[in-house]
Amino acid sequence: MLSATLFIFCVSWLHVRAETVSTRYGDIEGLVTSYPNVSGPFKSVSKFLGVPFAAPPTGELRFKAPQPPKAWKPKVHSAKTHGSICLQSKLIELFFKPVIMTPNFNYSEDCLYLDIYSPNTSLSLPVMVYIHGGGYIVGGAVTSPSDILALQGVVVVIIQYRLGPFGFLTTGDSAAPGNYGMLDQVQALKWVSENIANFGGNPSKVTIFGQSAGGSSVALHVLSPRSRDFFHQAIAESGVELSSFATQPTSFGLGITKELAQKLNCGSNDHYAMVSCIHNKRASDIQKAAESIRVDHSTYLSWAPVVDKNFLLETPQSLKMKGDFKQIPLIISFTSNEGAMAVGALASDSFGLNESLDDGVSPTFFKTYLAKFAHARDSR
């Protein structure tokens, strides 16, 4: 009862008003939220949610590099709610719904949006651009609300990028080079560089940071000539360019693409014909087929960046040996308790072990889970 009273009291003191900011593509209207501050006056954060940084990657733009968004001038774009998250497994809901209390996740192939949180749009503050993790197959801006970080005096940008086959399908040649999701990230960084000054951010003080696959993405941007001009510092959390999940050989990616093609009745030795057939399938059918692919994740992830001679010119090992990377301040770290949020979902979903972990992991549960996990891996 006390916690409910405190919650109602805090909410009653929130003040919300609209704010409009200009970009190269037109004006954007977001919301300013003021929060109580025990040590002084209210603190405010301007939120601009669901801002398009690229054209919808649908139709002819599926399996293609992102293109800039179309200008919406003289209209004003409403940026008061999150944009749809990219198509992915609904497994994400098991992990995040209990934490962020989002009633519904909206999934769409049209998902190249970013969220901006600014403590003051009239200043020139450092900028932090967050790249979410999720094994290149799940995640989105809605899972990373950043009011608290913005209140520390930085402009925070959360970007989205295509996932799974939509972001990383490859044949190893010009039929499907791959890395569309990484190029989405580059396009988002370019958008930030061109527009963030109007949101109170300094385009000359941009730090990119991310966790897990977001961390490896950050490290790959340090190696990529496509993105080097758009950031100045980097933080890679629980993932770097040499992590086992960071990239995959092109031959492995081609094998996954061929398996996807078989499931969609698109099998062909002609890569162009195969990709064209997949391209013409419904997005929901592609996603469903991709989720049915099973790989041994002790080797590589199903979908991941590859050497495409565009975003990634050579393997990370080769580029590092040559010293061909952006030399900037870099923090590499791990994330404490990063698996804690997933434990409950895994316990109730994996191997039929429906046991509450509210009071911790019992010795019986641990031994049973370990035995079943080992058996599952041995039987692959």
Regions found by a protein language model. Give the residues of each.
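Accessory cap/linker subdomain of secreted extracellular hydrolases
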Residues: 73, 258-295
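Serine-hydrolase-like catalytic core of hydrolytic proteins
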Residues: 2-4, 10, 96, 101-271, ...
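Cleavable N-terminal signal peptides
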Residues: 4-5, 16
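Substrate-gating cap/lid region and adjacent catalytic-acid/histidine neighborhood
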Residues: 241-242, 246, 277-380
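Non-catalytic accessory segments of hydrolases
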Residues: 10-182, 203, 297-299, 338-339, ...
